[in-house]
Amino acid sequence: MVRVKQKNLESYRSNGTYPPTWRNPTTSFAPDQHRVSIHSSLKSKTKRRRLYKEADDNTKLRSSSSTTTTTTTMLLRISGNNLRPLRPQFLALRSSWLSTSPEQSTQPQMPPRVPNLIGGSFVESQSSSFIDVINPATQEVVSKVPLTTNEEFKAAVSAAKQAFPLWRNTPITTRQRVMLKFQELIRKNMDKLAMNITTEQGKTLKDSHGDIFRGLEVVEHACGMATLQMGEYLPNVSNGVDTYSIREPLGVCAGICPFNFPAMIPLWMFPVAVTCGNTFILKPSEKDPGASVILAELAMEAGLPDGVLNIVHGTNDTVNAICDDEDIRAVSFVGSNTAGMHIYARAAAKGKRIQSNMGAKNHGLVLPDANIDATLNALLAAGFGAAGQRCMALSTVVFVGDAKSWEDKLVERAKALKVTCGSEPDADLGPVISKQAKERICRLIQSGVDDGAKLLLDGRDIVVPGYEKGNFIGPTILSGVTPDMECYKEEIFGPVLVCMQANSFDEAISIINKNKYGNGAAIFTSSGAAARKFQMDIEAGQIGINVPIPVPLPFFSFTGNKASFAGDLNFYGKAGVDFFTQIKTVTQQWKDIPTSVSLAMPTSQKQ
């Protein structure tokens, strides 16, 4: 048996990256060694268990060392293959743009391998297949993410399953304290998280901070879970009979994340799930997994017990394994319609609870009485922010009446936006995520031109000095678009604003409602009556009135509908708590022992 102390991961967090893995192993395992016992450092364990001792009923979450060793050994037992623990060493960062340190190593470095998190330990995958994580502004390889093996996936699910009984019985006040500490650690490490997101995903540093902050709000909301998870009680429903309902955790839950919000979407998922008492399997996007790994380490430092949160990486096979595994009770997904409907159908066929948030075509309706400057700024920010890679991006604008004066002003202001690497201080928008994404966006722009739309502003051929290899597309505006065009029917997911014209308010509402998507819609007007009509008549699930991106704060729920959502319960808010819990109803009666037995159906009528 090989004992490896797990390194405190402050070194990687200080540089905005994830923990380095065992790149050049000097220790090999003998063929008959099929078990690896991984012990966290005593310092880390002490921090993580300090909170458990504070439970109101003095519940002890710390198991004996022998029990911990036995359990972890069992979780990591894989016949013929060992889960390789991280070697306790810090590897110099490969590129200057990833580090906050002023000095960089001149030694050539191989990209680090992103670890899985299984049973409280970061372990290197034994997979033979890895995917490059690429900086979209430079095309440099940041790291390599594994296609997790089936044995490793099963070990992660087993760890979550075995952690569940103790975690669900942990006082809810203790679980809340973990979240309180977690939100504090996120705030302290926000700059490093933002740098990692900008490096891997491409969005500007300011936008990366927004990504983290919107997720942080969900963590803060989860700190009040004792109130959110309350049940209902009604005394004397019959003679001497009381009935109450309680909300209990489901068990092992899973989350499958997209590339466009590397911090926010994971924070929509696992903080709510684990604070309800569940354990969790997180699959980050293979394009930008670093933020999820950093967040997981912060969660463990905050006191989350081993096995409560696990991370597995991969693509289709990992997703299918999540859908098929009988021990996983619920799956939360954000991503494309193709993937979302596949996951919904496959997981639902296995009896799982599903929430699947998918594609969008969000419309902004502009009435002639709208405030000109405020509306133009809103359209630019919502259409081109994050290079248009938001599920709530305002990608389509419908002008009622004259459109030309609005379009001319839009073009003028869009030309002033700075397109460059997201880490540059003056960047307004960065690159799109990949070369394939850029090619698809450019194809849809050209399809609009071919179908008769007018290209008012073309950002396809932009070249950014110093970042010539980047996946950059400048702000692009198409005018005269009609509902039958592919550029309108498809979600472009890039910095492209599609402009349409309607002769009347009612016609504009009809155009919006005929679109298959229903994530969000916004109106820009000075008329309260028009705003109220819009609110009542529009079928989209989230409405903005002079608000371009109406994403609700977490005490409400994210409520996309139509083709933008599949499932019965939405993300966060009350619906999110309901999704990660199940209702148990208890009917009780305390009275003297009866002298006779009645076989009649019980009713509320006095017998």
Curated annotation (Swiss-Prot):
The record marks 260 as: Transition state stabilizer. NAD(+) binds at residues 259, 283, 286-287, 336, 491. It is found in: Mitochondrion. It comes from Arabidopsis thaliana. Residues 42-51 have a biased composition (Basic residues). Belongs to the aldehyde dehydrogenase family. It holds the Pfam family Aldedh. The active site is at 391 (nucleophile). InterPro entries: Ald_DH/histidinol_DH, Ald_DH_C, Ald_DH_CS_CYS, Ald_DH_N, Aldehyde_DH_dom, MeMal-semiAld_DH. This is Methylmalonate-semialdehyde dehydrogenase [acylating], mitochondrial. The keyword rRNA-binding does not apply.
